[in-house]
UniProtKB/Swiss-Prot annotation:
SUPFAM superfamilies in the record: Multidrug resistance efflux transporter EmrE
GO terms for biological process, alphabetical: axon guidance; dendrite guidance; protein N-linked glycosylation; response to endoplasmic reticulum stress; UDP-galactose transmembrane transport
Entry's Gene Ontology molecular function annotations: UDP-galactose transmembrane transporter activity; UDP-glucose transmembrane transporter activity
UniProt short sequence motif Di-lysine motif, positions renumbered to this chain: 334-338
Function in brief: Probable sugar transporter.
Location of this chain's protein in the cell: Endoplasmic reticulum membrane
Name this protein carries in UniProt: Solute carrier family 35 member B1 homolog
Key words of the record: Endoplasmic reticulum, Membrane, Sugar transport, Transmembrane, Transmembrane helix, Transport
Entry-linked InterPro entries: SCL35B1-4/HUT1
Length: 338
């Protein structure tokens, strides 16, 4: 059954929201909980899970297996995408993730809020410059309004940074690197979509295959693979949390790649950026927390921009609409001449 485009968009977006909401809860239990009864050097009881590379590696491996099984059960036409494109996409994706995790420890709170919320901007800019994508002016305005609205909604007064200037500068450089890598990932995905139009499952399988290999090599060289293995032997109960994270992450990434394959990386970036906004807004509505005027303004901006984008944002410029037939004609002429 072929669902209308807007229905599919809503289903994918809700799937991303729900899966990563549960993912965040379980991840916090894993990374902030303690395992065992041993007394540590700082006097605390129990070990913490500190294996960031291993956590992402387990996730990527499970994502790859899930996509591989889906494609085995329901085979699709061959994916003709160049392997180098997937390698580049996987590398920029992993660099963005690592840079973000490191930057958030070394940037002041306001910078962190802006950095987390501004992801659609480099995705849009580099999608135009490298991915050869074109957007209407309405979509540019809507995306910028959504980013501004999320920043206004999520920002909290009274958080003061005590970080030294050198550390802050390093964090800002890492944050810029993270946003640049996000933009490059989106641009490469746009090129892949334009060149070979793989399905969401095919993109998920290929990107997670290369990500698993890269992370595996990094874990071996850093020694984290051995430390992670010993930790899980000492505390096998950690596998319960890891398994739950894997399930939530697999389903969440499945919806993400369906979104990227059907609507492009910019639409996916907007959905993942507004995810935290909708999570906080739901908690406000459910538990009766009070919003201040600035947060109400941010909420109005986000909803207004999403509504306008839904109505008008997908109308491409005239030049873009005429481009595919021209390219098709040129390729036909090349075939005839050859």
């Amino acid at each position: 059954m072929n669902l209308p485009e807007r229905s599919r968009f809503v289903i994918y977006a809700v799937g991303i929201f729900v899966c990563y909401f549960l993912y965040g809860i379980v991840q916090e239990k894993l990374t902030r909980g303690r395992y065992g009864e041993e007394v540590q050097t700082d006097g605390s009881v129990g070990e913490r899970f500190t294996y960031a590379l291993a956590l992402v590696w387990v996730q990527c491996l499970c994502n790859y297996v899930f996509a591989k099984v889906l494609l085995t059960i329901r085979p699709q036409k061959e994916d003709t995408t160049n392997a180098g494109s997937y390698v580049a996409c996987s590398l920029t994706y992993l660099l963005a993730m690592v840079s973000t995790n490191m930057a958030m420890r070394w940037v002041p709170y306001p910078t962190a809020v802006v950095g987390k919320s501004a992801k659609p901007i480099p995705v849009m800019i580099l999608g135009v410059l490298i991915g050869r994508k074109s957007y209407s002016w309405t979509r540019y305005a809507c995306v910028l309004t959504i980013v501004l609205g999320v920043i206004l909604f999520m920002y909290k007064e009274g958080k003061v940074s005590n970080l030294p200037a050198e550390t802050t500068l390093l964090g800002e450089v890492l944050l810029f690197l993270s946003l640049s890598m996000d933009g490059l990932t989106g641009a490469v995905q746009e090129r892949i979509r334009a060149a070979s139009a793989p399905s969401g499952q095919q993109m998920m399988r290929a990107m997670n295959f290369w990500s698993t290999l890269m992370l595996g090599v990094a874990m071996v060289f850093t020694g984290e693979a051995k430390e992670f293995m010993y930790f899980t032997i000492r505390h096998p109960e950690a596998w319960t949390h890891l398994s739950l994270i894997a399930v939530c992450g697999v389903l969440g990434q499945f919806f993400i790649f369906l979104m990227v394959a059907s609507f492009g990386p910019l639409a996916c970036s907007v959905v993942t950026t507004t995810r935290k906004f909708f999570t906080v807004l739901c908690s406000v509505l459910l538990f009766g927390n009070v919003l201040i005027a600035r947060q109400w303004l941010g909420a109005v901006l986000v909803f207004a921009a999403l509504f306008v984008d839904m109505l008008y944002g997908k109308k491409a410029p005239l030049a873009t609409a005429k481009k595919p037939p021209v390219e098709g004609k040129l390729s036909e002429e090349k075939k005839l001449n050859s």
